[in-house]
């Protein structure tokens, strides 16, 4: 085992060696993998969206339309942003306006609040996206037999997001 290899004996792959001190090597490796995963996931979402007939949607638009369709309940922009862990309501608001122009969502006023619902066009898009996803991604992942592990990874990633949120708050007080 070389000095750069981790305890598991593998050579860490990082994108920013200046951040990969001995104590932070594993974290740097995770962050690089997370960056690669995020970029691949966004590329996948756009490819799936294009195949489903909506090439003009950004990754955020795709997340927002699926979130609005989730459980087929009306949602406020703040609810969508909170669920997706997005601080900048403006980006979600812009996305919702775009989705409304494309007739994928519609708005309804209830008192002081505006709620958004999926339209029949939006529902058709989301369902077609789901079918393409199952055909191209879910089937491919089945061959790896990692369903239980993916659930564990998802739990770990949600937990880590809390650490990053706390560290983000802490760094602002430095």
Regions found by a protein language model. Name each.
Residues 1-23, 147-174:
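C-terminal regulatory/oligomerization modules of transcriptional regulators
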Residues 37, 41, 129-144, 156-170:
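Alpha-helical linker/hinge and terminal dimerization helices associated
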Residues 46-87:
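N-terminal helix-turn-helix DNA-binding core of bacterial DNA-binding proteins
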Residues 54-58, 93, 98, 117, ...:
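Short glycine/proline-centered loop/turn elements that form peptide/ligand docking sites
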Residues 74-114:
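Canonical helix-turn-helix DNA-binding module
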Residues 97-151:
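Charged, amphipathic alpha-helical coiled-coil/dimerization segments
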């Amino acid at each position: 085992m070389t000095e750069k290899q981790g305890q598991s004996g593998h050579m860490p792959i990082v994108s920013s060696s200046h951040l990969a001190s001995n104590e932070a090597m594993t974290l740097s490796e995770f962050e690089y993998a997370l960056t690669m995963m995020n970029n691949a996931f966004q590329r996948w979402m756009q490819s799936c969206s294009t195949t489903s007939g909506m090439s003009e949607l950004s990754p955020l638009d795709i997340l927002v339309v699926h979130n609005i369709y989730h459980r087929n309940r009306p949602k406020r922009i703040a609810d969508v942003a909170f669920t997706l862990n997005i601080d900048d309501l403006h980006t979600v608001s812009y996305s919702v306006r775009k989705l409304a122009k494309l007739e994928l969502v519609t708005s309804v006023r209830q008192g002081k609040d505006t709620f958004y619902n999926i339209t029949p066009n939006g529902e058709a898009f989301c369902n077609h996206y789901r079918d393409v996803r199952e055909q191209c991604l879910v089937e491919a992942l089945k061959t790896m037999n990692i369903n239980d592990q993916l659930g564990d990874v998802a739990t770990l990633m949600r937990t880590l997001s809390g650490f990053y949120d706390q560290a983000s708050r802490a760094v602002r007080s430095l």
